């Protein structure tokens, strides 16, 4: 495949899906673990780094920064799209995941309220959120697409920052090697 960003994006997307499928098959609660969710960024970063290095070798490292950041950003976007599509599909096929997430969110919010927030207005908002979650837990749950698309869009901002960081890291490493 000629496009480096697309190649590493698809490869990384497959790796992330495999990683989360493995977690899901071992134990569902592992799939929902925030630490293991964040650990998947290592796959993102590895693919972004390889794409940036390969793109730099092919097109040169002295190009405009905006041109260099494209490959790792495309990698991030494709991996992230693959992840969120997998996440959405898995939640549609296994509604128990959404119940588990709701229970975790409810527990977290109750712990926050018990610990005390200090601000009465924030405490009232948290109580309202807890009531909404308790009502939601009673009804049959279906994963809506809207929040998934919102998370995908917000994640793209962070993805661009990661791509810029990887690009800067690769460029500075190349500059050090040339000295």
Describe the predicted segments one by one.
Residues 94-141:
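Membrane-interface interhelical loops and short interface/amphipathic helices
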Residues 1-4, 170-179:
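Short, charged juxtamembrane terminal tails flanking transmembrane helices
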Residues 7, 11, 70-79:
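Alpha-helical transmembrane segments of multi-pass membrane proteins
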Residues 56-69:
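Amphipathic, cytosolic membrane-interfacial segments at TM-TM junctions
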Residues 74-97:
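C-terminal halves and exits of single transmembrane alpha-helices
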Residues 15-19, 23, 44, 79-87, ...:
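Alpha-helical transmembrane segments of multipass membrane proteins
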Residues 1-59:
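Transmembrane alpha-helical insertion/packing segments
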Residues 139-174:
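Transmembrane alpha-helical segments in integral membrane proteins
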């Amino acid at each position: 495949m000629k496009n480096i960003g697309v190649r590493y994006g698809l490869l990384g997307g497959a790796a992330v899906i495999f990683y989360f499928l493995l977690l899901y098959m071992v134990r569902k609660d592992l799939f929902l673990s925030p630490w293991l969710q964040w650990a998947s960024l290592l796959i993102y970063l590895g693919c972004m780094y390889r794409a940036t290095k390969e793109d730099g070798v092919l097109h040169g490292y002295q190009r405009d920064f905006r041109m260099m950041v494209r490959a790792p950003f495309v990698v991030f976007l494709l991996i992230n799209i693959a992840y969120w599509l997998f996440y959405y599909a898995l939640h549609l096929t296994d509604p128990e995941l959404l119940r588990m997430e709701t229970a975790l969110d409810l527990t977290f919010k109750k712990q926050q309220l018990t610990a005390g927030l200090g601000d009465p207005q924030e405490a009232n908002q948290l109580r309202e959120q807890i009531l909404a979650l308790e009502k939601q837990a009673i009804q049959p749950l279906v994963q809506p697409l809207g929040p998934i698309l919102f998370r995908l869009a917000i994640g793209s901002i962070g993805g661009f920052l990661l791509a810029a960081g990887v690009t800067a890291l690769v460029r500075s490493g190349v500059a050090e090697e040339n000295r």
